[in-house]
């Protein structure tokens, strides 16, 4: 393998699925002989939305909603061809967004 590091960034709304997926990636990479740094928790992005409860009057009655995006960072150092093949074949949860940089 030409590159000496693979950087994997995981995003999800559910931190439990995110931690399970990160553990699967770490276990797969270590099984093939690569070194792993992480999972490193990145700051959680919190988006808050305020909406009126009533469609017509009573502006003081409002609801607040929030959406949290949890992120983790993994570095796989010294990957070999078996590591890349195993990571490609890995089936992660549907609610986890995976971004890979070589």
Curated annotation (Swiss-Prot):
This is Small ribosomal subunit protein uS10. Part of the 30S ribosomal subunit. GO terms for cellular component: ribonucleoprotein complex; ribosome. PROSITE patterns: RIBOSOMAL_S10. It comes from the Bacteria. Keywords: Ribonucleoprotein, Ribosomal protein. GO terms for molecular function: structural constituent of ribosome; tRNA binding. It comes from Acidithiobacillus ferrooxidans (strain ATCC 23270 / DSM 14882 / CIP 104768 / NCIMB 8455) (Ferrobacillus ferrooxidans (strain ATCC 23270)). GO terms for biological process: translation. Belongs to the universal ribosomal protein uS10 family. Gene3D superfamilies: Ribosomal protein S10 domain (3.30.70.600). The gene is rpsJ. Involved in the binding of tRNA to the ribosomes. The lineage of its organism: Bacteria, Pseudomonadati, Pseudomonadota, Acidithiobacillia, Acidithiobacillales.
